[in-house]
């Protein structure tokens, strides 16, 4: 499972089940929030700095860091499924606290403060973040149970929550609300997610993950 719907590969990820790296908001009125330090280690992240307007770089960094950190909690390291679910549950509660203006536990404060600023400044839909967490938790449970995806509709539903929210969040940052644009973004993000899955089949199989529709595999005599 991955939030790499924008073809993200990283060489140094946030440590699984550990507190995220520290980061502080800008001090001056209207000053841009510095990029979260850990994000700068991801090899494809400079795309945000090179191609995006300067005012959007910090919000994009905050979204990326949240998604990457949650994804790492779900599938990096050697934690048990229960430990991963507990960590994501803790992050979910902290996210809700941040978005509702309540104090956030120290473990997640530096990760979520820039995200909260981005959400407030750009009116980002809260549900897109919880969709990501839902997808990560589902992936943990299915992997732990040795359960794959019954058919293409089942797999596409997973992409709807694991990949599409990132594209929609980026469109919201740019002020795009047109339904046709959102649907086009969904199609692109889902396609990139599927490509990511299928180019990593050998790696995922060794980790108990299988992102091919089981009905089609059975029809073609494919036994993972």
Residue spans for each PLM region:
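Acidic catalytic motifs of isoprenoid enzymes
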Residues: 2-20, 24-224
């Amino acid at each position: 499972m991955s939030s790499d719907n924008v073809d993200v590969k990283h060489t140094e990820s946030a440590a699984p089940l550990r507190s995220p790296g520290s980061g502080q908001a800008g001090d001056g009125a209207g000053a841009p929030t510095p990029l979260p330090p850990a994000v700068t280690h991801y090899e494809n992240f400079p795309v945000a700095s090179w191609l995006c307007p300067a005012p959007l770089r910090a919000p994009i960094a905050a979204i990326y860091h949240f998604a990457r950190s949650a994804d790492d909690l779900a599938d990096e390291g050697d934690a048990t499924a229960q430990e991963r679910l507990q960590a994501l549950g803790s992050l979910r509660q902290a996210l809700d606290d941040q978005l509702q203006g309540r104090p956030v536990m120290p473990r997640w404060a530096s990760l979520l403060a820039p995200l909260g600023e981005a959400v407030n400044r750009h009116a980002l839909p809260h549900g897109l973040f919880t969709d990501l967490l839902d997808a990560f938790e589902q992936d943990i449970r299915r992997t732990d149970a040795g359960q794959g995806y019954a058919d293409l509709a089942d797999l596409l539903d997973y992409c709807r929550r694991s990949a599409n929210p990132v594209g929609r969040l980026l469109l919201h940052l740019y002020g795009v609300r047109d339904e046709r644009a959102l649907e086009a973004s969904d199609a692109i993000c889902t396609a990139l997610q599927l490509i990511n899955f299928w180019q990593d089949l050998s790696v995922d199989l060794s980790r108990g993950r299988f992102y091919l529709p089981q009905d089609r595999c059975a029809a073609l005599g494919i036994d993972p």
